[in-house]
């Protein structure tokens, strides 16, 4: 599977801002919820885990991959991508986040290919910069489709 194949319809979005990290999580996971990749309990599990453990899913400056354990409400494996024009702070000590990659992993293995492809994409500085400065959903989708 190509990386873009993990993104269901309408799962790539650009938003002006989030009021707080909780709303950023909601933005990030809403298309996965609407497309029945997760249930509402999955989103609550991410928020609860963030309060308990901190934002363990911040991958790099400006980039987060919110997710929870499969048994918390993941129904199918898929991803979403939300770019915030104005970054949001998760904690006082962590870098603010601008790009959220929502992950639903239905089991321990089905998302490994997507994570590998995503890691390669994020390690290429020019592509990461292009994601962080994209102006539209189409630009974001084109970058992911070329990965």
Model regions: which residues?
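Cytosolic covalent-transfer regions centered on His/Cys nucleophiles
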Residues: 1-147
